[in-house]
Swiss-Prot record:
Zinc finger (C3H1-type): 99-126, 175-213
Region (Required for interaction with DRG1), start-end ranges: 238-262
Assembly: Interacts with drg1.
Record organism: Danio rerio
Main location: cytoplasm
Protein name: Zinc finger CCCH domain-containing protein 15
Upper lineage: Eukaryota, Metazoa, Chordata, Craniata, Vertebrata
UniProt-listed InterPro entries: ZC3H15/TMA46_C, Znf_CCCH, Znf_CCCH_sf
């Protein structure tokens, strides 16, 4: 027996994946950017068939879950290694305007900080307590109560109490000064002040006072008071204005209202006339600054007929409507009404009128035997005068007619025998020839 052929070497995984991707790309060419549900479903089915073959959906889901499980295991291993060997901590970055002392040093937390007191970040582990998760050994209700107790719910007494508790001891240690810290005032005005607020100007080491002076009123409280003072109801405004009028006033009735309205209208018309006269005087004086185009033509109507290069030659004349209606030009042309009696049919006199015969369409015209030469001469106008034949031509025609009538006609030209012979020839005639 001949030796068996060796089995082909298994292809590399990468080459197989490339082949599969090539097949998927060919089958789904032009469908990747389609958003339709059918196209997406088809693409998903093709990729599943090419990559996994005829596998069951459960097998595919199990394979995916194994992959995710492996990834999670790798992450856990990395986190354990980091905890054991304490890798290099990334440099801390603080946003602008934040005090570095209010942020816990990441190197100190890992036990790697070598700067000591020179470190710009805080080495107080209690700072992390404000942002860390709940601990089983710490009662979180104390902090929760303080977090809920914000400045929005405080009055002036509560605010003074919080300030004294928070900054009372530190204020006693500081040098005597009456200047209030601007950061402290900004925090109070913008509702940022609270139990966990830290002064950006140095915290407890700030040289300025963190306490409100006696009789201090916040800006927002001032604005609220001004708004309340300015807000007056319409009824109160009417009553105050009525009280200021006094007793010697005219009561409003229909008659007084109509008289007032008439007076106001007359004043308005008089004012309009005064304005028009003033504008007219200004226009005549050459001050046409506040005069409109319509008023210009009202003051000087002759400007309508003025022409320039782009205007037409039409001239417009001013006309009074009533005068034009009274002096209309009367039309002198006579007009006759339509009389129906004119359209009654009447018998017409046939004297001097040629009437065509009734059988002119059925009757045949007499045969003419004109010679072509005569026709040519007629066409050229030789023997025809004013549509009538000359006497010579009529004589010639008469002679020709006599000659044609004198020709003898053989009536027995085609006898019965000749016709029979003609029929036989037609029957025996070969059409193919």
């Amino acid at each position: 027996m001949p030796p068996k052929k060796p089995a082909p070497a298994a292809a590399n995984k990468k080459t197989q994946e490339k082949k599969k991707e090539k097949i998927i790309e060919d089958k789904t060419f032009g469908l990747k950017n389609k958003k339709g549900a059918k196209q997406q479903k088809f693409i998903k089915a093709v990729t599943q068939q090419v990559k996994f073959g005829q596998q069951n959906a459960r097998q595919i889901a199990a394979a995916e879950s194994e992959k995710t499980k492996k990834k999670d295991d790798k992450k856990k291993e990395l986190s354990e290694l980091n905890e054991l060997f304490k890798p290099v901590v990334a440099a801390q970055k603080v946003s602008k305007g934040v005090d570095p002392k209010s942020v816990l040093c990441a190197f100190f937390k890992q036990g790697q900080c070598t700067k000591g007191d020179k470190c710009k970040f805080s080495h107080d582990l209690s700072l992390e307590r404000k942002c860390e998760k709940r601990s089983l050994y710490v009662d979180g209700r104390d902090d929760e109560l303080l977090e809920k107790d914000t400045m929005e719910n405080w009055d002036e007494k509560k605010l003074e109490e919080v300030v004294n508790k928070k900054h009372g001891e530190a204020e006693k240690k500081k040098a005597k000064t009456q200047i209030v810290c601007k950061y402290f005032l900004d925090a109070i005005e913008n509702n940022k002040y609270g139990w966990f607020w830290v002064c950006p100007g140095g915290g407890d080491n700030c040289m300025y006072r963190h306490a409100l002076p006696v009789g201090f009123v916040l800006k927002k409280d001032k604005k609220n008071e001004e708004k309340n003072e300015e807000e007056i109801s319409l009824e109160d405004l009417i009553e105050t204005e009525r009280s200021l009028l006094g007793a010697n006033v005219t009561r409003i009735t229909l008659e007084t209202f109509l008289a007032w309205k008439k007076r106001k209208r007359q004043e308005k018309l008089a004012k309009a006339e005064q304005d028009m006269e003033r504008k007219k005087a200004d226009f005549k004086a050459g001050r046409a600054l506040g005069v409109s185009g319509r008023e210009v033509f009202e003051f000087r109507p002759e400007l309508v007929d003025d022409d320039d290069e782009e205007a037409d030659d039409t001239k417009y004349a001013e006309e009074d409507y009533n005068y034009g209606m009274s002096n209309q030009v009367e039309d002198t042309e006579e007009v006759q009404d339509i009389d129906i009696a004119r359209f009654i049919p009447k018998e017409v006199d046939n004297a001097g009128i040629t009437v065509a015969s009734a059988d002119r369409f059925t009757a045949k015209a007499p045969p003419t035997n004109d010679i072509d030469d005569n026709k040519l001469s007629e066409a050229s106008g030789g023997t025809m005068e004013n549509g009538e034949h000359s006497e010579d031509q009529t004589l010639e025609d008469g002679e020709t007619n006599e000659e044609s009538e004198a020709v003898p006609v053989d009536e027995n030209l085609f006898t019965g025998e000749d016709l029979d012979e003609l029929e036989e020839e037609l029957n025996t005639l070969d059409l193919d020839e």
